[in-house]
Amino acid sequence: MKILLANPRGFCAGVSRAVETVEKVLEVEKSPVYVRHEVVHNKVVVDSLKKKGVVFVKEVDEVPDDAVCIFSAHGVSLQVEEAASKKNLVLYDATCPLVTKVHRGVRLASNNDAECVLIGHKGHPEVQGTMGQYRSEKGAIYLVESEQDVAKLDIKNPDNLYYATQTTLSVDETQGIIESLKNRFPNIKGPKKEDICYATQNRQTAIKSMLKEIDVLVVVGSQNSSNSNRLKELATLEGIDAYLVDNPADIKSTWFENKKVCGVSAGASAPEYLVQQVITEISRVCEGDVVVEEFDGIKEEVYFPLPRLLKQKIIGTN
């Protein structure tokens, strides 16, 4: 059997920055180090950081006063920021810069008393953080997940309206909803196209480009990873068997019976070493009869610098 490796795959710049932030904070600060929410949606990464002394909490209320705390890559609401400030925490913000861009857009809309529509998945931590950027008493922020939701919107002033999107959605996922918004509210304003997360789109494009070449797909990523689930869905929608795995132990030999080409990719929160371990396990269950090839794709060269406070601490300790 042949294994085709999707490109790009795995860690995006925002995830790399978040994980590196936690690891560097562990070096420059005294334990324990608290992280609000899973820093990224990957069980293996989170478990590894727990072993190094990181304490993950759901809310800042669980963090002792004056302690060291990190915000996850998904970002937080203004209410969470204020709660952290009251506790006098040593705070490092690992929010993805692309999420921060979305936050700025929503806050600007709020400051202008414009109502806001957010395209995203209900309950996702990024969505909760973005919704929590809106404070205007003269308007509201609405969450839509489908074109049907757009039809139900009751907007107070359609001439002063803004929309934003969850970063882990792709252009393909949001296109129909955005068109529905523009059809119903012709004066609605939105972000620039380049504000859309490059990583989500690139990883989905990579999968789409190899679908005609494969008859089974394995995606390395956790069940609670939005972008990993989308990668799997791209294959299943085309009638291709697809599986989402946290680690090599999830691999089953029956998946590859009578299969000729297996595609392998990874969500934006999955490290490359996990991908290589999964490949090794696939080769083992296929009794070594495997050839591995890289599938050509977009080359990513995006880098996000560490939080300013952390860079200052690193310089101060050297």
Swiss-Prot record:
CDD domains: lytB_ispH. Pathway: Isoprenoid biosynthesis; dimethylallyl diphosphate biosynthesis; dimethylallyl diphosphate from (2E)-4-hydroxy-3-methylbutenyl diphosphate: step 1/1; Isoprenoid biosynthesis; isopentenyl diphosphate biosynthesis via DXP pathway; isopentenyl diphosphate from 1-deoxy-D-xylulose 5-phosphate: step 6/6. It comes from the Bacteria. Disulfide bonds: none annotated. One of its GO terms (molecular function) is 4 iron, 4 sulfur cluster binding. GO terms for biological process: dimethylallyl diphosphate biosynthetic process; isopentenyl diphosphate biosynthetic process, methylerythritol 4-phosphate pathway; terpenoid biosynthetic process. Its EC number is 1.17.7.4. The active site is at 126 (proton donor). The keyword Oxidoreductase applies. Keywords: 4Fe-4S, Iron, Iron-sulfur, Isoprene biosynthesis, Metal-binding, Oxidoreductase. Pfam families: LYTB (PF02401). The keyword Transcription does not apply. Coiled coil: none annotated. Isopentenyl diphosphate binds at residues 41, 74, 124, 225-227, 269. Binds 1 [4Fe-4S] cluster per subunit. Dimethylallyl diphosphate binds at residues 41, 74, 124, 225-227, 269. It catalyses: isopentenyl diphosphate + 2 oxidized [2Fe-2S]-[ferredoxin] + H2O = (2E)-4-hydroxy-3-methylbut-2-enyl diphosphate + 2 reduced [2Fe-2S]-[ferredoxin] + 2 H(+); dimethylallyl diphosphate + 2 oxidized [2Fe-2S]-[ferredoxin] + H2O = (2E)-4-hydroxy-3-methylbut-2-enyl diphosphate + 2 reduced [2Fe-2S]-[ferredoxin] + 2 H(+). [4Fe-4S] cluster binds at residues 12, 96, 197. (2E)-4-hydroxy-3-methylbut-2-enyl diphosphate binds at residues 41, 74, 124, 167, 225-227, 269. Its cofactor is [4Fe-4S] cluster. Belongs to the IspH family. Catalyzes the conversion of 1-hydroxy-2-methyl-2-(E)-butenyl 4-diphosphate (HMBPP) into a mixture of isopentenyl diphosphate (IPP) and dimethylallyl diphosphate (DMAPP). Acts in the terminal step of the DOXP/MEP pathway for isoprenoid precursor biosynthesis. This is 4-hydroxy-3-methylbut-2-enyl diphosphate reductase. It comes from Francisella philomiragia subsp. philomiragia (strain ATCC 25017 / CCUG 19701 / FSC 153 / O#319-036). The lineage of its organism: Bacteria, Pseudomonadati, Pseudomonadota, Gammaproteobacteria, Thiotrichales.
